Amino acid sequence: MVTNSYMDTRSNLTSVNRGSNVDLEDRFQRELESLLQQHRNQQSFGRERERDIDVHRSGSAPPTVEGLLRAMDNQYLNNNNSDHRDVGNISSITTSNGVELLSDDELRWHPEYLSYYYSNEHSNPRLPPPLLSREDWRVAQRFHNSESVFDPVGEWRKKTVEVDNSSSLFSVQPGVPVEQAENDLMELRNAVAQGRSQKVQRLDQGREDLIGLSGYSGLGPRRKSFADILQEGLERDAALGSQLSRPASCNTFRDMKDAAVLSNFSAGGFDSPLAFHDSLHSTAKNSPNTMLGSTMSSPVPRNRTPDSHLVGRSTASGLPPIGTRVGPVEKKNTFGTAIQNCESYTAADVADTLSRLNMSEMSQVKENHMQSQLQVELENQSDVMRYIPNGHKKALRQQNTAETKDHLFSANYGGMSGYGASLGASTVGSHGQVNIPKRTSSSASLYSTSDHSRLGSVGLSDVNIRNGNINGTDFSTAGGYMAKNKLNSLAEHYSAEGSHLTGDGDRQSLNRLINQVASELHSPVMDPHYSQYLHTASSTAAPIDHSLIRNNFGTSNGDTANEYLAMLLAQNRQQLGNLNAANSRFFESPSYDLGNMYLGNHLPSPSKNSRNFQNMRMSQSASMMKVPFGGLQGSSHVDIGSTAEASLLEGFKNNKTRSLELSEIVGHVIEFSMDQYGSRFIQQKLETATDEEKNAIFPEILPYGRTLMTDVFGNYVIQKFFEHGTTKQRKELAEQVTGHVLALSLQMYGCRVIQKALEVVELEQQARMVKELDGSVMKCVHDQNGNHVIQKCIERLPQDWIQFIISSFYGKVLALSTHPYGCRVIQRVLEHIDDIETQRIIMEEIMDSVCTLAQDQYGNYVIQHIIQHGKPHERSEIINKLAGQIVKMSQQKFASNVVEKCLTFGGPEERQVLVNEMLGYTDENEPLQAMMKDPFGNYVVQKVLETCDDQSLALILSRIKVHLNALKRYTYGKHIVARVEKLITTGERRIGLSSSLAANTTP
């Protein structure tokens, strides 16, 4: 191939480089031969890569995947120089003076051949068909544009085509050194060898990641969208992944703002990890947690998506790698993003620099940094939560649960990162799972050089287990089994054992112990402000002071013996006492919650099945906090005689035969009031309760009066107290309402309490309550809840006290009458306001728009109300305004109801006017026929047959009989036919009966 086309190629090169000597031409020849050899090497490497891929390829993969991979391998030939060529170059290469210069295989491998062949410009029918179908070629082109994953093959591919901006074997530019081609070939071999060794390592470790080959999925990588990244973040169950992550490629260093930082980093210019941390923090604004997670060359975290084509996809530019937790300070400029585009530093340089870092000092810096951030966030959250209504906290819980959980876990377990990083990939999940990988050649050296006392950073001394009540042991109360003494005695007993944990056997034993204990641990508790909203499937306990645990287990750099003892105690939880576990629902609504006390919130917080609140007695919480940490999840059995005391509400709901009295639920009134069954129990008891029983539970109700008023079940308890409570209790509850009438009136459940209060409280308190609505009357009228309060004010209060409400309706009667809620208010005004002047003003506005309101979906109710409940002259005036439009109104959906009301409540004369208009003035009775066939008019005709007198009935029946057969063919006419036949039968009987009676009375 080289010898056949060498002369022509050399002539082309000579034409480009006129004036070059023979030595230069010989050098070009050698370079061309080396490039062709490199091309053949790439072909063989591509075949080897395909064989590797076939091992992991699914048996159901489509047959075109192999061709697609081949096309993607060929994309390395496309470079920026493709912009300077066009498809016509193929023709010049293929045919020059009628002589074919390239073989069929060479043509097929040409980078422009596919686009030329599948375009409409080629005119040579003898061109060999390409190896790739048109569909596969299009897919390859599309995926080539989005391919941006670093791997040994991809990096070699880039460097192959970037030699002096050359993008094709057939467009070689002069000046390419032979040494560069040899270096590329050696780099390729090294990359392949390194990729194989990495794959063998991953297989030994039982991993499924395919490092180094981004196209294993068959479709190559695709750029993640924001939705993908967000979804993966929500699905992750740990703040730290099961593996430490690393940058997707060396290109992740490119965006570093200060090149001097990287130069010092690469050269080992930092004398201490503090200097290294400060420099990175000032440059990239990133915490050490993200820095370590981004720079350690641990495996890429496993992708959890079930889609096979997503296995090899990479993170988008500007986002940290998946598995790296981003803190608040890092969100806009993370270190993972800042180092994404560096080209000058290799992984070996980074690893060499990191190996010189003091990991214990770095972990301490990281812990201090994260704790300072958490302190600020906790203070901010504390301020916010004090002013958030109880109703809004439930939504806030859903927004902050995952984020707060991951962030706090990252901070609390931050001390483990030093040890975990030194081992390579030792991590701790948010569920307490400790993953320590198998010992490898790299970890062996770290074992031999690291200080084994750093094992303490993996233990519980550096973990905030405020709610992680170990094995149900109560660390915060004086009663029960005191684990402090037990831990101290065990610590003395095993203190000599710490020096024996340095051997390989003991390390393996410790690893096994850690993994066993990890299965027993649960996720650490979140910020106390949010802990009451987290309903996990596992049992939880009350918070524990972190300082108590630190005092027993030592500092963050505690010795190995204490950590070993902590894990030993967690594993052997049965030795700490014979404790019975309640089900998980019991802990979702404890009688007492230290988290709520710490919160300082005066409102009870909801749970799944019932409500809990914070003013329960300490004696009840002491026993509850002693339930084993592991718990018996899903069990409904509760041993009342044990140290765990069952909830009174749960016992009441589970035991239907048990009878309780109000005096027995003292201390649990709020919990009962906010439960469906408990609220119903209190309501029933209040109806027949004595004053003593009411006074026994009312002191618990009063402090949470406004909270219960807006609760779905608690509002009924407040209403019952307004209805059946003593005068003093009603007054005190009314004082709770003062200043909040408008807000409660606009609330779904609060509006019911306001209505009940307006019915029973004294007039003076009624006046004060209604006065708070001044200036917001129209807002309440247009509200689905507030309109009921306005109606109650109109019904219950004297007109002098609510004149500000009535006067706000003047000039707006038509608009209010056509409003879904305003029409109800206008009806109450017409019904309860007796003032003549007020009635006149309202009726004038209504009479001016009778026909409009009669046809409106809401206004027709106002007209019907006047016809049914209004004065006779008002009804006659409305019928007169409708006269002449009866047939039209009868065929309208809403106005037909008004016509029926006129026939029902109108006088005989008014009714006769309507009947005459329906019959018409001809013998054909066209209006009557049209009404009988109409979906709405037929009901008006039926109402006429029900309400008219005998004379009118006989006349109408005689007219209908003529059209009876025709009506049977119409859907709505059938109703008339059935009604007429029934009336005819009834009428004939009535006529016959009348005739017989007349004959008997004749002498």
UniProtKB/Swiss-Prot annotation:
Domain PUM-HD: 644-984
Cellular component annotations (GO), alphabetically ordered: cytoplasm
Organism per entry: Arabidopsis thaliana
One Gene Ontology biological process: regulation of translation
Lineage, highest ranks first: Eukaryota, Viridiplantae, Streptophyta, Embryophyta, Tracheophyta
Pumilio repeats: 664-699, 700-735, 736-771, 772-807, 808-843, 845-880, 881-916, 917-958
Location relative to the cell: Cytoplasm
Compositional bias annotation for Polar residues: 285-300
Protein name, UniProt field: Pumilio homolog 4
Domain notes: The pumilio repeats mediate the association with RNA by packing together to form a right-handed superhelix that approximates a half donut. The number as well as the specific sequence of the repeats determine the specificity for target mRNAs.
